[in-house]
Amino acid sequence: MSHTMPAVVHYEHRDGAVELREVPVPEIGEEDALVQVRSVSVCGSDVHMWRNLLGHKPRVPVILGHEFSGFIAKLGNRVKGFKEGDRIASETAAEICGVCMLCRTGLYNLCPQRKGFGHYADGAMTRFVKVPSRCLHHLPDRLPFRKSALLEPCSVAYHCTAVNTRVQPGDFVVVLGPGPIGLLALQVARMQGAGRVFISGVAEDAPRLEIAVSLLGASRAIDASKEDPVEVVKSSGDGLGADIVIDAVGISTTLRQSIEMVRPGGQVTKVGWGPAPVGFSLDPLVAKGARLQGSFSHNYRTWERVIELVTDGKFSLDPLISRVAPLEEWEKAFSKMEERVEVKAVLTPNGPI
């Protein structure tokens, strides 16, 4: 094994400060695994880091990539339950304190000291990544690596829509934002028995909105550049609004729309991130007695459930995977996602999968 490897590195807090560079192969500790990365998918946050658009400042330099799967190449001598050669996927919490109340009760995704791969710890857009064994999950042989790279966003969507939001059979659900998380949340809502699921985007989202309706079962797509999503929702059904609104965009405009379109006693779940200030009153939320719920990341239980669902074909992932490409083509993959021409790109740092 070479002592260095190519990696996609974010090196400064400015637009375009990402490049492919040679970095050392990481050393592992007694409770770590060295994972040979077979597939790593590009997240919208990776593109935002490339364009310096995140609302927070990640560590620099840092290797990007937090949605990945591969083989165990090497194990620390205190790791149990895994062996070299095992097919695995990894959670994203590269560092947690392990001793706070949240960590001890299984909510380690909310640990105040959490540091995620690709943001505050080196990620997987490279050939090998150091992973704490507590992050590892076994992968069934019949789950291909091109799909297992999407287990992380599937887990985000499931945790948002099935754990932090309790969709009831027959519920009217609206998803704002047809990005990967929005398209996956749409699928989870349908799994949970939602009656109607609308999805809203802007003109640039037209290809994704078409996928949502034609391939993923959305009841209706709303082009917010042509019609008011709030009016569309309120003119549907009994006129009181949606039982559940999933805000997978996260900016002020969509949060305001969410609060305006949710029905009295309903729930808005915000899973999208956005740097823009709120700048409007939240009083309508109070008047409606509605709930505003945040959803962040996922935990072990969610991951195990999602692995079963993806392996059994309950998620439709092929329409979302627009590109499978070598690591060296990272910039083209980022650009196509930025342009919203493609939904999801999967990079293969160690050759074809």
Locations of regions flagged by a protein language model:
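C-terminal hydrophobic helical "lid"/dimerization subdomain
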Residues: M1-H3, L184, E227-D228, S235, ...
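Short N-terminal strand-loop motif that marks the start
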Residues: M1-S69, N350-I353
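Glycine-rich beta-strand-centered segment in the early N-terminal region that forms part
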Residues: P26-V40, L53-M101, C135, P140-R142
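NAD(P)H dinucleotide-binding glycine-rich loop of Rossmann-like/cofactor-binding domains
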Residues: E95-L176, E204
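Mid-domain Rossmann-like dinucleotide-binding core that forms the NAD(H)/NADP(H) cofactor-binding site
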Residues: L143-K226, E231
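Glycine-rich phosphate-binding loop and adjacent beta-alpha segment
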Residues: A194, I199, P207, S219, ...
